[in-house]
Amino acid sequence: MTIAIGKFTKDENDLFDIMDDWLRRDRFVFVGWSGLLLFPCAYFAVGGWFTGTTFVTSWYTHGLASSYLEGCNFLTAAVSTPANSLAHSLLLLWGPEAQGDFTRWCQLGGLWTFVALHGAFGLIGFMLRQFELARSVQLRPYNAIAFSGPIAVFVSVFLIYPLGQSGWFFAPSFGVAAIFRFILFFQGFHNWTLNPFHMMGVAGVLGAALLCAIHGATVENTLFEDGDGANTFRAFNPTQAEETYSMVTANRFWSQIFGVAFSNKRWLHFFMLFVPVTGLWMSALGVVGLALNLRAYDFVSQEIRAAEDPEFETFYTKNILLNEGIRAWMAAQDQPHENLIFPEEVLPRGNAL
């Protein structure tokens, strides 16, 4: 028996090798295998949003004007969610709702599902792009891991939350004022600001902003003067082997300010990664809880005492009254298909009234 030892070589490349060579070639804009998902989905999501905000009304789904064509501006235009009666339908253009009629599909809110789903896969494609490039240049994949935070928030807010509710109708519409309305809705119907997962999200995002500002200022403060350039940007060679700033000086400064300081760059930068990403993950988990209508902090004893004693009121009980007002005033406007009519005597009023 003869055993041949050596590298197997093919006479000609197959289709996979040809595609792999073209997709991963070094060029000005890297394409990669991830680009097959990223570029089409991003193109369709952005294009669908521009189309919807420019031309498509929300009259048939929300009773609203939502396009530039109807007189909206950048802050008030939106791609609105489908009607509540359509529940969780994917609203495919060729589906039973639109039956291939593009105008009818737009009127029913088909552009929202189009933008939401292509947007989600576009974001996932962007994360895969970071994985692919990191692999190609032999980097760790922490950029992609960090980007999972925004993806988790997008998927939880735009997809998982409405899936837990009665339909896509209760997801945010894609517009500035529409997102603000959704935030008010979250507060009024879920008391979102008192939710511990929201608190962790705020701590993560604002904490990351603080860390970013402190880190940037500290590096600028401890730059070595190695060059004779006129300013910071000309004083260094981008290929220099030496450190650009003094970690020792920075450590001494913050040790004197706070009594503690980061002892090495790895721990410092990991902490700057950990704080915002964990905050985003936690807020995404909280939104998943809201999709299931889970409640967080309910201080019932304070509510009972406030109801019995007109002189007792806390910031919590005031906020509960505010939430009741949001629900009573917002539901009738936000869900016109329900024909909700609240008589004056049931609308909430503060104890002072």
Curated annotation (Swiss-Prot):
Fe cation binds at H215, H269. It catalyses: 2 a plastoquinone + 4 hnu + 2 H2O = 2 a plastoquinol + O2. Its EC number is 1.10.3.9. The modification N-acetylthreonine is found at T2. GO terms for molecular function: chlorophyll binding; electron transporter, transferring electrons within the cyclic electron transport pathway of photosynthesis activity; iron ion binding; oxygen evolving activity. Chlorophyll a PD2 binds at H198. GO terms for biological process: photosynthetic electron transport in photosystem II. Keywords: Acetylation, Chlorophyll, Chloroplast, Chromophore, Electron transport, Iron, Magnesium, Membrane, Metal-binding, Oxidoreductase, Phosphoprotein, Photosynthesis, Photosystem II, Plastid, Thylakoid, Transmembrane, Transmembrane helix, Transport. Coiled coil: none annotated. GO terms for cellular component: chloroplast thylakoid membrane; photosystem II. SUPFAM superfamilies: Bacterial photosystem II reaction centre, L and M subunits. The modification Phosphothreonine is found at T2. 2 of the reaction center chlorophylls (ChlD1 and ChlD2) are entirely coordinated by water. Photosystem II (PSII) is a light-driven water:plastoquinone oxidoreductase that uses light energy to abstract electrons from H(2)O, generating O(2) and a proton gradient subsequently used for ATP formation. It consists of a core antenna complex that captures photons, and an electron transfer chain that converts photonic excitation into a charge separation. The D1/D2 (PsbA/PsbD) reaction center heterodimer binds P680, the primary electron donor of PSII as well as several subsequent electron acceptors. D2 is needed for assembly of a stable PSII complex. Belongs to the reaction center PufL/M/PsbA/D family. PANTHER family: PHOTOSYSTEM II D2 PROTEIN (PTHR33149:SF12), PHOTOSYSTEM II PROTEIN D1 (PTHR33149). This is Photosystem II D2 protein. It comes from Solanum lycopersicum (Tomato). The gene is psbD.
